[in-house]
Amino acid sequence: MAISHMQELSLLLPKDLLDDVLSYLQNLQSVEIQDLQAKETWQGAFEQELVWNPDKSFSEHLQTLTRRQEKLANMIERLQAFVPKKKLLESLKEVPLEITFVDLEQAGQARDEEALLVNIQQQFQALARAQEVKEMAQSEMAELEKWASLAVTPSALKHFKHLRAFVGTIPSSENNQLNARLRDYPNLEVREVFTSSTEKGILVLCKAEVAKETQAVLTELGFKLFEYAFEELPKERLVALQATIKEQEALITSTQAQLAASNEELQQLKLQLDYILNLTSRQESKEALASTQNLVALEGWMEQGQIEDLKTGLAQQFGGAVLLQIHELTEADRQRVPTKLKNNALIEPFELVTEMYSLPKYEDKDPTPVVSVFYFIFFGMMAADIGYGLLLFGGTTWALKTLHVKPSLAKNLRFFRILGIGVALWGVIYGSFFGFKLPFALIDTSTDVITILIISVVIGFVTVMTGLFLSGKKNIRMKDYAAAYNSGFAWMLILIGLALLAAGRLFPALAMVGFIGEWLATVNAVGIVLVSIISAKSLKGLGPALFNLYNISSYVGDLVSFTRLMALGLAGASIGSAFNLIVSLFPPFARFSIGIVLFLALHSINMFLSFLSGYVHGARLIFVEFFGKFYDGGGKAFKPLKPAEKYVRYKK
């Protein structure tokens, strides 16, 4: 059970070296910076304004960096929409951007960020303008096409002295009324330009002296004037608009091609964003520091084994300008220490289960090694199948060897790779290979159901016993001996006694074992009552003692919970066998054509459900039946100052 030994340290440095020291610590990725304003030892100095934040323009600088982040992130998002996307598998196989921290810092400082953004922004603006012009031309064409047969422009008609012309539309429903009204005005000439289901385009000519009366009549009929200010005919205007559209389409195509070929610019933006994210992290860390006119104080946590490397690195980088001091931890300090788990390659992936529940406190023990054993058994037993296990192991191994994934995903892949071994091993025990029965099965899932049930309960019994033992051990370490007995060792002995008693009742030859078990359970039940009364120094301890004994029902429930190991394992095996039976009913030709596809599809579903059940129910057994006996969690994760890895991977 490994939790890294942490050491508290403090650095005192000249103010002009602050940015360099923070950059060095960020590259080191080993120091978690403490907030000095939250520490009691520093609060008085801050209140009296003996010390203050080293950056008086902290908020302004942070806001500036945030705006730069937003600009870069927005530009990356917009540019990625044009750069050809690779398929998911190809993108995962692609080697990520790799660079050293120092090179990223130097490149970030030297890069003309504003010019890079302006250059790309200009292309987007050109594209937007071209699309806008094209859309306006298309809209005008759609309105103008119906007037293509108009042989004279409205502006030309305005030059007549003795005639007045009206060009526009009326609703189609008003056509009959128009004809009727025209009879009252024999000097009017009406020409139809176009007709649609909703409106009719007309050209109306009249003498100048009756223009007002004509306009009034047309208005009553819903006449709408055709707004056209060009000297060229509509059909000529349509030709010009078509040319404009083609021109803008060519411009759009060329601009989109330029944006699609901007992969180098996209990489530069990604590198710059990670650089700005690093600057932001360092800027945010300044809020946790204390400063005078010339000096800055920094306190933090670091793994004990890395202290010497820090001393050497600071001396090489800054000479004697930075003072490093190591503090011995007191009992009060241990409550503040962050937790960093440290396990070997086989155990480390199972830290995911522990972290999902809660990290242990620094003064506690890491339960991950024990969790790894039980979770390995639980998951394997609930998904037991050789084929499923080999696929899980092979698939995760291939992904780890072939794909370039982030460290967090790689840890998950290693986790499931180990679980794949457990699934295959239990598949050997059950003799199951993709639902087919193998001749060397140690336990037959169709006939040995009671045996599997007993194994499940025994595994549950061992799990509960382990939890109770760890509970007793934890309380002894805390010097709470009464709790160690009442909540741990006494219940271990009671449950062992009850198990022996049950064995004696079931097997007459073990009658003496049953007698011993009966006394073992009775003596420890009485012991819980006596220890509770003695520790309370009065009969008030009797109530908690009786309530504690009443919890025997919860232990029965815990053991019953472990029957899911049998139930889910048998369910997966039965469903897989049923799928095989369905495929076997097909005629030979169908069996080896569509039957293969159906076999793969059905077993994929069953495999997914088996793994999902194993993952969820395995975690449930750990969290409730195991952790519920001894583990509180509540630890604070160790969070060192680290560089951002949104797009880049750092070379050592």
Regions inferred by a protein language model and the residue ranges of each:
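Long, charged N-terminal accessory/stalk domains
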Residues: 1-371, 406-409, 413
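Conserved, carboxylate-rich catalytic/transport cores that coordinate ions
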Residues: 2-7, 14-30, 308-652
